[in-house]
Amino acid sequence: MTLGGGPPEPAVRRYWKASDREGVREYPAMHEGEGTIRVRSFFEGVIRMGVHFDVWELPPGATEGRHTHRSDDPKDDWEEFYYVVHGRGVAIFEHEEVELEPGDALLVPPDVDHGLANRGQEDLRIVLVIGKPGPP
């Protein structure tokens, strides 16, 4: 993470900059899925918006296993926003599959069983924002 936006050692931090080429973690069999998903999380410990901001890369054949974030569990009542940047994938729900391609966005509220699969020939790259849902 690079600090910048002012003199060499500013008294007040004005902004943070990060690269998706650094700090990548690998998650094999995420939620009992197939293959390994590469995840880059941004601004952990710095961001105050109440969200997690990640970039995920699923190689061909990789999946995030189906799972549910439960609204009755304060540690797991997440809402997830997916935005497809590159590649093609499939969002998997209990009784439906939804094709995803670059430019598509998907919002999954708590209590919805869901997963993700890359059935294409190239990496599937997704921006994922995870946060607690607000009041209706």
Each language-model region and where it sits:
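Conserved short histidine dyad/triad with adjacent acidic residue
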Residues: 41, 54-75
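Ligand-binding loop in jelly-roll beta-barrel domains
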Residues: 47, 90, 110-135
